[in-house]
A protein has these predicted regions:
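Interfacial/gating helices of multi-pass transporter permease domains
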Residues: 38-61, 123-129, 191-192, 233-238, ...
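Alpha-helical transmembrane segments of multi-pass membrane proteins
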Residues: 109, 122-148, 276-279, 338-363, ...
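Interhelical loop/hinge segments that connect adjacent transmembrane helices in multipass membrane
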Residues: 1-17, 127, 187-198, 207-249, ...
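Small-residue-rich hydrophobic transmembrane alpha-helices
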Residues: 48-101, 105, 145-154, 269-323, ...
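Membrane-interface helix-loop junctions in multi-pass transport and translocation proteins
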Residues: 169-206, 325, 385-423, 432-434
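Alpha-helical transmembrane segments of multi-pass membrane transporters/permeases
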Residues: 83, 151-178, 192-195, 199, ...
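Helix-terminus/linker motif at the lipid-water interface of multi-pass membrane proteins
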Residues: 28-48, 115-122, 178-189, 246-282, ...
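Short membrane-interface helical motifs at transmembrane helix boundaries
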Residues: 102-129, 318-344
């Protein structure tokens, strides 16, 4: 088995993994800086106001996963025909713009009712509404920038992805310093400054990306006769991914985000999520991106590399355990969070459940790499209807009373339940495709297309 494991690890593209880690580390840096800056602001509600954006972003995530995830495939299909590619980029950009304008308008108009529905503390609803309205505009620029970057990668300009990632970091550092910080020369815009910073940075990056794309002969703002016919097939594929995200995020919004608001712990939960998703899960999520790339390029990589994927995941989990003594100093001196004991206990509790998530990440990334989004939809329907459906009934019956620890346990056990369902789907897929991940033989290097 050890020989097979070494063989599997040698097959993995660690250079690409390192590049993905560096790309993922950039948003971790500026998000951590933002947590620190919020901790320096006067008043006790800064984290809670910023935390309201977490459930708003879930609305955008649903559309994002329905559009961006299938986009690489549909643009990649036509990269050899510049005329068809240009049409798809132009029409796709217009459709994305239209969808996000509608969503952004809805958030702006219904901000207060949505906050009330989410059981937000009435005293912070006006400030929270102002903030999420600003962020909704920023999200519009962000998704359009992401769309154009996908187009640039499709035409072979992947180097721009690295350039824009570095530029994004520098722009955020400068913008946040001048708009959010408490330094003497800062505009001192508080939490809203983060939203304005996002608008400024993403608008600049969108303009730059569109200019570079125009130099490649593709003008997203050009006038002319364009065909939207290809989007019928795009909608079929995107709807499955979007439906899976809808089921998953609606359950999370109502059973986790709303419950956290009910117990007035949105700030603590938001900072905990930033720490977990920004630092602990960074290598896990980027491993998932690597798996998607390797599996989509050659389905035989499931058999050849999966042992290595699980070994890397195990090493990441061990590193989490080793790093625990450094968490409190980091939370005090870097995050600047006052209630460190509460934050530390919450992260420590959630970490055990996220180990299950880390291994599930291998299963789910394999599904995405093969284009089997129907497996993801199956997971979401089973987990969110059975597990969270039962939890909701217990809550309405007054049997389960939400507390911060209780909500964390609810979410964590949901992760375990979802991981079990995902593993069952993964085992079914391997059996159906006749793939034995315990036998990464070196002799079979053929390029076999994904089913």
């Amino acid at each position: 088995m050890l020989t097979k494991l070494k063989l599997s690890l040698r097959n993995i593209n660690f250079n690409l993994y390192l590049a993905l880690l560096l790309l993922g580390f950039v948003p971790t840096i500026y998000n951590t800086l933002r947590v620190f800056l919020l901790g320096q602001l006067p008043g006790e509600w800064s984290f809670s106001i910023a935390g309201q954006l977490s459930w708003v972003n879930l609305l955008y995530e649903i559309i994002n996963e329905a559009i961006i995830l299938p986009l690489f495939y549909f643009l990649g299909q036509t990269k050899s025909d510049r005329a068809i590619l240009s049409n798809r980029i132009h029409t796709g950009f217009l459709a994305t713009f239209g969808i996000y304008v509608v969503l952004t308008t809805m958030v702006i108009v219904f901000a207060e009712p949505m906050l009330a529905c989410m059981a937000t503390d009435p005293s912070i609803i006006p400030a929270s509404a102002s903030y999420i309205r600003i962020e909704s505009v920023a999200n519009l620029f962000a998704i359009l920038t992401q769309f154009v970057l996908v187009a640039l990668v499709t035409v072979g300009k992947i180097k721009y992805l690295y350039v824009f990632t570095g530029a994004r970091l520098m722009l955020y550092l400068v913008a946040d310093t001048y708009l959010v910080s408490t330094l003497p020369f800062s505009a001192n815009l508080g939490v809203n400054g983060i939203g304005y910073s996002n608008i400024l940075v993403n608008a600049l990056l969108l303009a730059a990306a569109a200019t570079l794309l125009a130099k490649e002969g593709i003008h997203i703002f050009a006038r002319g006769a364009f065909s939207f016919g290809w989007m019928r097939e795009f909608a079929k594929i995107g709807s499955i991914s979007g439906l899976e995200s809808l089921v998953r995020n609606v359950a999370y919004t109502m059973m986790i985000s709303r419950m956290v608001n009910i117990v007035n712990e949105q700030g603590t939960y938001w900072v905990a999520n930033n720490f977990i998703w920004g630092w602990l899960l960074l290598p896990v999520l980027q491993l998932g991106e690597l798996i998607k790339q390797e599996v989509s390029s050659n389905r035989q990589n499931i058999r050849r590399n999966s042992l290595g994927y699980f070994a890397i995941t195990t090493m990441i989990a061990v590193l989490w355990l080793v790093s625990i003594p450094g968490w409190k100093p980091f939370m005090v001196h870097v995050l600047g969070f006052d209630e460190v004991e509460k934050l530390f206990s919450l992260v420590l509790l959630l970490m055990g459940f996220y180990i299950f998530f880390a291994f599930q990440n291998v299963f789910d990334a394999t599904f995405y790499g093969l284009g089997k989004t129907n497996y993801m939809l199956f997971e979401s329907v089973i987990t969110n209807s059975l597990y969270y459906g039962a939890a909701f009934c217990l809550y309405k019956a007054g049997i389960w009373i939400p507390t911060l620890t209780g909500i964390a346990l609810l979410f964590g056990l949901g992760n375990v339940f979802d991981s079990i369902v995902s593993f069952a789907a993964y085992a079914f897929l391997l059996k159906k495709q006749n793939i034995n991940i315990l036998n990464p033989q070196p002799g079979e290097i053929e390029n076999s297309p994904a089913p």
